[in-house]
Amino acid sequence: MNKPSIAALLLFSLISISGMNKVQAQNLQLYYDAGRGCATSTVEMFRPDAGGSTFFFIDFDYSPKVSGAYWEIARELNFWQDSKVNWLSVHLEYNGGLNVGTAFNNAFLGGLTYSGHSKDFTKTWSLSAMYKAIPGTFDASGKCQMHNFQITGVWGIEFAKGWCTFSGFADFWREHRTWQGTEFIFMTEPQFWVNLNKVKGWENIHLSVGGELELSANFVAKGFHAMPAAGAKWTF
């Protein structure tokens, strides 16, 4: 599964906080995941409003039939967009899914997000600290361990006069996985995109090509893993 372009969510959230609350975005991403040997599609939607913003994404894995599904929906609450603390928002999130033979535990998150940006919005960043409830999680002794935490950092950088975008996220969270004897998980997915709407005559072609590199510890399996994926993204 691919994590969404949360950096895009951050960018649009910051724009909406700055008063441009009519901004909204949807995109479709297609990847070939060389590490897993499968294809992945991702649909994302972002929409701001007077009280904050809503974002969701849905992933499907294909190998070649649908072999997995995963989704997240997040709400940023910010009723104080005109105040001096509009950089702070309340974050609420749900995620869950399944693949062949098993299902991911439902996860419910809540916490605070700090967001920042450069004057021209070509550089954006955020840091979220969240409580994470994962019902049905137990440690090796059989004790329920549903109460956990997650820290998420997000960045987005647009450069080369808008031709290129470097974005991504880094997650660190606690989740007991008795089958592999681990308790903490780290994952980051830096993405690089070339934006083809900068080609002369292609201004209305909202296509980007590039990909991502998933780096994780104790996520796919115990230990460190690197999984590159080539992709294309259409924004509409």
Provide a role label for each language-model segment.
Residues 22-24, 51-53, 78-90, 117-126, ...:
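Short loop/turn motifs that connect adjacent beta-strands in outer-membrane beta-barrel proteins
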Residues 43, 71-73, 110-112, 151-155, ...:
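Membrane-embedded beta-strands of outer-membrane beta-barrel proteins
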Residues 22-64:
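Short glycine/proline- and aromatic-enriched beta-strand/turn motifs that initiate or cap beta-hairpins
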Residues 1-25:
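Cleavable N-terminal export/targeting peptides
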Residues 224-236:
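Outer-membrane beta-barrel "beta-signal"
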Residues 132-208, 214-218, 234-236:
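Outer-membrane beta-barrel transmembrane domain signature
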Residues 30-36, 60-64, 92-98, 129-135, ...:
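Transmembrane beta-strands of outer-membrane beta-barrel pores
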